[in-house]
Amino acid sequence: MSQQFNVAIFGATGAVGETMLEVLQEREFPVDELFLLASERSEGKTYRFNGKTVRVQNVEEFDWSQVHIALFSAGGELSAHWAPIRAEAGVVVIDNTSHFRYDYDIPLVIPEVNPEAIAEFRNRNIIANPNCSTIQMLVALKPIYDAVGIERINVTTYQSVSGAGKAGIDELAGQTAKLLNGYPAETNTFSQQIAFNCIPQIDQFMDNGYTKEEMKMVWETQKIFNDPSIMVNPTCVRVPVFYGHAEAVHVETRAPIDAEQVMDMLDQTDGIELFRGADFPTQVRDAGGKDHVLVGRVRNDISHHSGVNLWVVADN
């Protein structure tokens, strides 16, 4: 009989936590016992998992000694408090927040890109999960990086409101309904109205004029590729789409490569679905519920001898 694990999801009632629950079930992960954890406010809420009803427990009162693996998605402050305590007690923590991503002794892992880094979890019993926009970009760029190297990445993201959690989803839905019925939109989650609008700000602005979301893509790319020489120039935009992120990616490679070669490599890469010719993926039509990274509009840069353009879409 294969090994089974007792798994805890901390932040189980959030948008990401609920998706974690769905993925564990869909992938038939070998779960022996499942524990759903959240704040006292969500205690008692129930979910179905593998034909059973599982009740959400208060994290403050939970006995962690029975847990082997914990998936954290309850926010950076809570991860900062709980993850080291639980990891030191022997729980393997996989953290979905940004809190541990830049610690030198904690692996930042995309299984399709740097699976060898997983072994470093033994340093502190914590594995960090990269930002969603970084993940889809690097899955698409990994074959190019391995083949000819990458000098520079210019990327503009078009990120759905679900990246801001349930609050973002509710705000887009609420604003859209009000505006279509002739009422003014109320703005709480985003810096400006998101319905029928695009906002070139995700997270706070930093001293260099970039947002923190944009700098995450810089730092994470360099760490995951273990290559601090890669230059990354991102602009991150929140768009009025409920689910799925899209990215217009331009790379300057260290040696020239033809777009046909790039497409052939992508077509043979696990985890990528390639769209050729005039067909291209979109968040609404193609990305929902898919694990693959979708790539289209692959073409050589007409202004640079070592440039390649890609359109990259994924369910965040």
Swiss-Prot record:
UniProt pathway annotation: Amino-acid biosynthesis; L-lysine biosynthesis via DAP pathway; (S)-tetrahydrodipicolinate from L-aspartate: step 2/4; Amino-acid biosynthesis; L-methionine biosynthesis via de novo pathway; L-homoserine from L-aspartate: step 2/3; Amino-acid biosynthesis; L-threonine biosynthesis; L-threonine from L-aspartate: step 2/5
Gene Ontology MF terms: aspartate-semialdehyde dehydrogenase activity; NAD binding; NADP binding; protein dimerization activity
E.C. number(s) listed in UniProt: 1.2.1.11
Entry-linked CDD domains: ASADH_C_bac_euk_like, VcASADH2_like_N
Superkingdom as given in the UniProt entry: Bacteria
Family to which the UniProt record says this protein belongs: Belongs to the aspartate-semialdehyde dehydrogenase family.
Protein's UniProt name: Aspartate-semialdehyde dehydrogenase
Pfam family, one: Semialdhyde_dh
Biological source species: Vibrio mimicus
